[in-house]
């Protein structure tokens, strides 16, 4: 029976249905009450942290569905376009920003790919570098608040470790995210030098015009992130503020959200959040079964007997998570892997919040890992480019992100400086 359920998963069955079926089969085999599955959904609905998820998702989808990306592209290009490789730097910054708000680098590729790739090619960037920047330049945006994967990780990990909160993860991701932004932006500048891109003259008039056009969107990251990092608002309050601000600005100030379009965006948000919550509820039911059967303890004993050195464990952990990121979306992976991984990492002395940053960085990289990373397929469809060409174009950025991952993994202070 379990084999049949797994076969359905491989054939494309919804993951919540697969998890639900696995939970019920496992509960029946163990003689456990089926009502526990329903109880998990009820407990999930009462979690205070969960309130932040739909509001941040709505804000991200509204931004992606409006012309905000065009205005912000004009603004960042006016501010940085005069630099050598300025447009490539703009590409990395803009993709990272949108990924942080949508929680999905694939959505960023869909929203910005058709805008950024022609601009990069027109400026004279080599096609390989341009494809790599558009496909992988925004992956590490999941480390910045108000990323949905950060919120989901906190929801899953907090019952295991009280140190893991949304606010703690938002702070922990800041310095690693800035490091990634600097390294990938540096690569973009180098790509501009290498292609001998002529520098554009800096225009105060163009910068002022671009700033005036996007004057209502410029305060968004400063207000929201300042409130979160400054401790003035909890995550759920910041989520409501973000959604309200974005809806007012895009709907009433810029008038780019007519009711018909907003209805579609709300529908997409509900589909995303509803899917995540169903997967989360069913996944937590499976986790309860695994805990009842002492599976985490068995894994602890098995791994502990084979790996004694924490540094070796971290290396094995990264290899495992990169493989997971290639074949599983970040939400499903968080629900399935974190409950088993968190107790194991604690045994090796890995700080729980630091583990969250390592986990999300790995899965973000896995999205563009050749040959099966999800972003490669999304970019192939959006940019009308062969998959293997995109995989080859992403190799340089993959190497840079792996170097960043090593620093994140073996330099805990990078993640924990603001948390402590």
Give a label for each model feature.
Residues 1-420:
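Alpha-helical transmembrane segments of multi-pass membrane transport proteins
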């Amino acid at each position: 029976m379990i084999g049949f359920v797994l076969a359905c998963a491989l054939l494309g069955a919804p993951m919540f249905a697969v998890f639900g079926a696995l939970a019920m089969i496992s509960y029946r085999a163990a003689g456990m009450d089926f009502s526990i599955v329903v109880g998990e959904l009820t407990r999930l609905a009462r979690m205070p942290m969960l309130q932040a998820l739909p509001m941040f998702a709505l804000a991200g989808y509204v931004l992606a569905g409006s012309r905000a990306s065009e205005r912000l592209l004009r603004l960042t290009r006016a501010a940085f376009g005069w630099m050598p490789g300025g447009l490539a730097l703009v590409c990395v910054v803009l993709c990272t920003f949108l990924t942080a708000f949508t929680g999905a680098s694939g959505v960023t590729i869909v929203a910005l790919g058709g805008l950024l790739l022609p601009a990069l090619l027109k400026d004279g960037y080599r096609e390989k570098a341009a494809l790599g920047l558009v496909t992988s330049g925004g992956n590490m945006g999941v480390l910045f608040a108000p990323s949905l994967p950060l919120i989901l990780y906190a929801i899953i990990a907090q019952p295991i470790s009280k140190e893991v909160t949304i606010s703690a993860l938002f702070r922990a991701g800041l310095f690693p995210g800035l490091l990634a932004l600097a390294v990938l932006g540096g690569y973009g500048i180098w790509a501009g030098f290498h292609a001998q891109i002529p520098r554009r003259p800096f225009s105060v008039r163009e910068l002022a015009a671009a700033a005036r056009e996007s004057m209502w969107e410029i305060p968004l990251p400063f207000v929201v992130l300042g409130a979160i990092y400054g401790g003035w608002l909890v995550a759920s309050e910041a989520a409501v503020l973000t959604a309200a601000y974005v809806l007012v600005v895009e709907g009433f100030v810029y008038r780019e959200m007519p009711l018909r379009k907003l209805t579609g965006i709300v529908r997409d948000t509900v589909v995303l959040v509803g899917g995540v919550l169903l997967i989360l509820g069913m996944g937590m039911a499976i986790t309860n079964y695994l805990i009842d059967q002492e599976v985490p303890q068995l894994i602890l004993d098995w791994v502990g007997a084979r790996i004694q050195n924490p540094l070796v464990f971290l290396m094995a952990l990264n290899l495992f998570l990169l493989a997971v990121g290639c074949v599983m979306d970040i939400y499903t992976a968080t629900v399935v892997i974190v409950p088993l991984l968190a107790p194991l990492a604690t045994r090796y002395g890995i700080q729980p919040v630091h583990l969250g940053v390592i986990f999300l960085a790995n899965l973000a990289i896995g999205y563009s890992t050749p040959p099966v990373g999800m972003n490669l397929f999304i970019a192939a469809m959006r940019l009308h480019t062969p998959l293997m060409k995109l995989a080859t174009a992403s190799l340089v950025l993959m190497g840079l992100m792996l170097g960043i991952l090593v620093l994140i993994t073996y330099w805990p202070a990078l993640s924990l400086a603001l948390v402590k």
